[in-house]
From Swiss-Prot:
Gene3D superfamilies: Helical domain of apoptotic protease-activating factors, P-loop containing nucleotide triphosphate hydrolases, Ribonuclease Inhibitor, Winged helix-like DNA-binding domain superfamily/Winged helix DNA-binding domain. The gene is R1A-10. It is a peripheral membrane protein. One of its GO terms (cellular component) is cytoplasm. This is Putative late blight resistance protein homolog R1A-10. It comes from Solanum demissum. It is found in: Cytoplasm; Membrane. Keywords: ATP-binding, Coiled coil, Cytoplasm, Hypersensitive response, Leucine-rich repeat, Membrane, Nucleotide-binding, Plant defense, Repeat. Residues 407-428, 520-542 form a coiled coil.
Amino acid sequence: MYFNNELSDLKDHLLRKLQYYTYSDVVRDRINFILWEFKFLDCFLYLKSFPFASECGMLHVSQKMIEIWKSQWNKLIYICMYDEEGSPWDAVVYWKELISQTKQEFRAQYSFPKSPLAANEVIDDDDDDNTHSPEFVMEVIGFFVGNINVLVKINDPCSCFFVPGLKEQIEQILKELKLLRFLVCFVSNKCIVPQYRCTTFYTRALIEASYIAMVAWLYLPIYGNGNQDLAPSEVSRLLSDFMEMKIKSIEPGISRNSIYIDVLQALKSTIPQAQKKHVEIPTHSLTVGLSDQMANLQEMLCLLRDNLIHLPILDLEFHLQDMDSVIVDAGLLIYSLYDIKGQMEDTSLDVINWALGFDLPRNIEPIKVMAYLVMQKAFHCNLPRIHGLGYVDFLLKNLNDFQDCYSDSLAFLKNQLQVIQTEFESLQPFLKVVAEEPHNKLKTLNEDCATQIIRKAYEVEYVVDACINKEALHWCLERWLLDIIEEITCIKAKIQEKNTVEDTMKTVIARTSSKLARTPRMKEEIVGFEDVIENLRKKLLSRTKGQDVISIHGMPGLGKTTLANRLYSDRSVVSQFDFCAQCCVSQVYSCKDLLLSLLRDAIGEESERRELPDNELADMLRKTLLPRRYLILVDDVWDNSAWDDLRGCFPDVNNRSRIILTTRHHEVAKYASVRSDPLHLRMFDEVESWKLLEKKVFGEQSCPPLLKNIGLRIAKMCGQLPLSIVLVAGILSEMEKDVECWEQVANNLGSHIHNDSRAIVDQSYHVLPCHLKSCFLYFGAFLEDRVIDISRLIRLWISEAFIKSSEGRSLEDIAEGYLENLIGRNLVMVTQRAISDGKVKACRLHDVLLDFCKERAAEENFLLWINRDQITKPSSCVYSHKQHAHLAFTEMHNLVEWSASCSFVGSVVLSNKYEPYFHDLSSLHDFSISRILPNFKFLKVLDLEHRVFIDFIPTELPYLRYFSALIDQNSIPSSISNLWNLETLILNRRSADSHNRVLLPSTVWDMVKLRHLHIPNFSPENKKALLKNSPNLDDLETLSYPYFARVKDAELMLRKTPNLRKLTCKVKCLEYLHQYHALNFPIRLEILKLYRSNAFKAIPFCISAPNLKYLKLSGFYLDSQYLSKTADHLKNLEVLKLYYVEFGDHREWKVSNGMFPQLKILKLEDVSLMKWIVADDAFPNLEQLVLRGCQDLMEIPSCFMDILSLQYIEVEDCNESVVKSAMNIQETQVEDYQNTNFKLVLIEKWPKFYKLFSQLSLPRGLVLHLGIESVSSDEKEKKLTVTGDVDADEVQLVVEKLRKCGMPGL
C-alpha cells in the first residue's frame, strides 16, 4: 500500500526527523497514533482508483482529504521540510489536527456512510483483474484487521487509542472481518467452477471490508481528540445500527447475502480436498435470535469449530469431504436465514421453514451428528497409546468426589455415571490379573482389553470435566456416556469370551520355531572382556564335580551371545567335554525345536525324531547325556518357564558337566543358577572400546596416526556399548580414511547409533508387561547422564497412575517391585543401594535406552520434550500437542512460551540441564506461575524439580496429584485445600530462609489424599482447629519437616497421621530433663529423623516406635539414661545414626546386654563421646560401624572383636588410639575368626591434601584413604610410594601416623 508520492515524501521526511529526538510516553503515543492514521489513509488513497470506491464512501473521503490538504499544502511543506529550527512535534500536532478536521467535516456532510449498492451495479467484467484476486482481497482485509485490532489491546485511558465502552462493538467488527477473510480463503481453495461467481464474491467481500474499515476509521477512536463531535454513547449506537444494517436488503428485492448463497451453492458440486487451516466455521453472524433452533445451530457450529483444531491432519483429511458438505450446508442455511429475515421482520420459525422450503430442525441434525463425531474423534486420536493400569483406580475415587462436590452440575448424568462406576469396579479384578501376569501367549489379548478399558476411563474423566465446566452440550455428553456404557459392555463380552476359550488357546496356538526367531550367527572374533573370559573359563574347567550353570546376563548389545559362543568354541574348553550342544531359545520358542537342536548336535540328524512327542524327545536327550560329561549352551532365555522346559533334560551325575546360559534378565539368570553366581556383563572400558573400533575398521592393520585422536573420541562417544561401536565401525569402514570425514561422523554420531540400535532395544520393550511399559517410557522425561532419585521417580509414577493397586500392599512397595523388574531386565542401571536393606536409592539409564524412551514415547503420544533449542515455534504446533501427553522442559522460558498450546496436557516435568542441587538457591529467578496455569486445566503433575520459585500456590487445579517447587512465602493459603486430589506436595525454601517458620493452614488436613508432604520448618497455623475439626490424614506416609515446640504439638500431629512410615522433624529442646515422657509414634513408622532447633539441649520425650528401623538424631544433648530408655522401645531398630550429639556431663555411653538387638549399622559423627562402655552381648547383629570426627573417643570397645556379624569398620578423622583399636579388631576378625569379608577403612584428612581420595591396599585388608593423587604399597618391602602435589613433610606425617597405628616396619 502506497501513499501518493508527494504526501509520502512529506511523511517519510517527518519520520526521519522524529527519530533523532527523545520523547515521553505521552508524546510517543501520539506519534504512534498519527502513524496509525497514516496507515488507513495509505490504503484508502490506494483503493480510491477502483470502481467500487465511490460505492462505499471511500472516494468521497479521499477527495475530501485531498481538497483540505491542498489548501494547507504550503504550510505542510514548510513545517516538515524547511523549518529546521522548529521541533518535529509541531508537524505532528498539525498533522493530527488536519486528519481530525478531515474526519469531522466528512461526518458533518454525511450523517452515516453511504451504504454500498447491489453487486450487479458495481461490478464490471472489465475491472482490473487485481480486484478479483483472492490473495489481494485477503491482504487488504488482513491489513484492516491488524490496524483495528490495536484499539482492542490498549487499556490506558490516557492513550489516544483508548475507546471506552466500545470494546464489544470493535470485537464484533473484527469478527466480521476475520470471517470475511476466512470465507475468501475457503472459497478460493475449494471452488473450481463457475469462476464468474467467485469473481463476484471476491469483489463483494472487498466492498464489505472497505465499508467496515471506513466506519471504523471515521468514528474510532473518539478519545483524546479534543474536538470530537460525537459522545461515546452515540458512537456505540451508530456501530450497533451498522451491524444490524448488514442483514438488511440493499434495496427492495436485492439481498446483501445473495452472492454468498450463490457461491456456496457452487461449492456444493465442487468440494476438493483441502488442508485443515482452511476449514473455518461462520459462527460470527449467528447473533440473530430466530428461536431455540437457531441457538442450537450456533452451539453445534461452535462445538464443531472448537474440536476441529485438535484433529491431526491425517484424520482431518479423512473426514474433510463430509465436513465440507456440512460447513457449506450450514453456510447456505445461515445466509438464507439472513436473506429472508432481512425481508420479514418478526417472522416465526414455521413461516421461515415454509419460506425456505425445508425443515430447520431436520437440516440442523446432520450438523449435530458431525459435531459429535468430530468431538469424539478429536479426543480419541490424541490419546496416548501407552497407559498406566492405575488410571481406573483414580477415576473411581474421583467419580465419588466429583458427584459429591458438583452434584447439581452432574445431576442429569447421575444415572449414567453410576452405571459406569459399577462397570469399572467389576473390571478391577481383570486389570489386576493383567498387572500381575507374566509374559504368555494371551498377554496381547489381555493388554488390548486393558488398553480399551483405560481409554474409556480417559473419556469419562473428560466428559465429567466438560459437564462441570459447561464446555459441551448436555445432549452431547449424555450421548457420549451412553456410548461408553455400550462399549464397556462389548469389552466385558470380549473378556468373557477370552476366558472361555483360554484353555483351548493354550493348546492350539503353535509356538514359532526358534530357527525363525533368530538367524544363526556366524562365529565372531571377540575383542575385549579378556578378564571376563578368563574368569568364565576357570568356572567351566573347575574341579567341582557337580553340575554348574554359568549364567551371563546384561542389556541388549553387550555381546552376551558372542562371548558365550567364544567360550563354547574354545578348544581348551571343548576338549574337556564328551558332548557339546547348543540351542537358541528366543522370545517365542518351540520346545520341540529346542530338543531337536540339542539332539542334532549330540548324536546327529534324524528326520524320524520330528514325529516324536516332546516328552519322548526330552527323555531321549536325558538318556543321551546321562553317562557323559557335557557342555550345553542355552542362548537368549527370556523367562523362567523356558528354562523349566529344558532343565529336566540335563542330568547331574557329578561329572563336572557345565551349562552356559545367556539372558537379558537378572531374575532368569538367578533362577537358573546352581553353584556359580550369575555374571552381570559389564560395559566396555575406553581401551576395549578403541580396540574393537580399530579392529572392525582396519582389520589386522593399525589406525593411521592422523586418525587416532578422532578415532578415540568416536569410540568414547559410543557409550561403551559394543553394539554401538560395531555400528559406528560399519559407517567408518565405508568412508574415506581422512580426518574431515571422521569429524563428520563424530558430529552426527548420536542419531546414527541410536537409529540403528533401536531394533534391539525395541525387542526388549515389546515384551515388557503392560504395566511396565509406561514406567519405562517415563524415564524419557529425565536428562542424559542424570542420576535419578528413586523416591521422586516412584512418587511420579504413582501420581501418573502407572501403579495398579493391590490389596495388602502399599503403592510405594508395588512401584519398587516394578523398578526391580526393570533393573532385572537390564533396562535400568542401579547407581546406589541402601546399605541397610539393599533397596535402590538412585538409578540411571544408558543413553541408548534413554533416547529410545524419548523417541518411542513421542510416537505413542506419551511424552513430548520441549528443548531450549527447539526449532519449531509454539504457534506452529498448536494443533499437534496431544491431549494427555506428558511434557518435559529443560528451561522455564520454554514452559512459558508453550503453555498456551498445552491445554490438555496431563503433566509437566522440568528437567534442568544444570546440576540438580544448588548451593545458593537465592540466585534463581522468580517465576510467575499465575501466567501459565490457566492453560493447564487437566494438569495432574507439576514437577518444577525444586528449582523454580513461584509467586503463588496454585489452587485451581482439581486434578493435580503431584506438585513440587520453591517458595518465598512464610504461609500457605487456606485455599490449598482446593487441590483435593493432591498426593505429593513438596515446597522447598531458599537457603537463606530455611530457618523461617512456615505457617500451615488447618485446611491442609482436609486434603485426605496426601501421601507425601514436605515443607521445611512448618507448624500448624491453628492448633485448636486442627485438634477439633480436621480429619485424619490416613494416607500420609512421608512427613517432613514439621517443627514441634511442645510435646503436645507432636502428639497432636502424630494422632492425625496414624499411618506414617517416614518422619523428619525439628523439635524444641529443653535445658535438662529428670524424667522422660514416652512419645508414642505411629505403629507403622520405619524411619525417623530428629533435628534440634536450639543448640545441644535435651530431647523432650523418649521415642517409642516398635517397628522403627532407622533413627537419626542430630544436635541433641543425651545423658546417660536417654539412649538406654529409648532402646527399650526400639527393639527392631536396624540403623542408628548420631550426629553432633553431646553425651552428658561425663561424655560416656554405656550399652548394656540386650540393647539394640537388631541393629545392623551404627554411625557416630562429630559426637562428644570420650568413654564408650559396651557389654559383651550388646549389638549381636551389628554389621557396620562408622566413626567420623570422634576426636575425644579413647578407643573402640574390645567386644567388637567378638561380634561375628561385623563386616565393616570405617574410621575417619579420629585419634590414634581409635585407629589402633580398629586395626586390632580387624586383625582378630580376619586372622582369628577367618572373617574374609571383613573390611577396615581408615580415612585421614590432611590440611594440604585437596585432591580426590585414592585407595591404598595394605596388609591384612587395611584400606587407607589419602588426599593425594596416587599411593601404592609393597607389602614385602614395607615400602610406601606417594605421588602428587605433596611435599616430603606431608609424606613423613603419613608415615609416622601409620607407624603409630601398628605398622612400625614401614
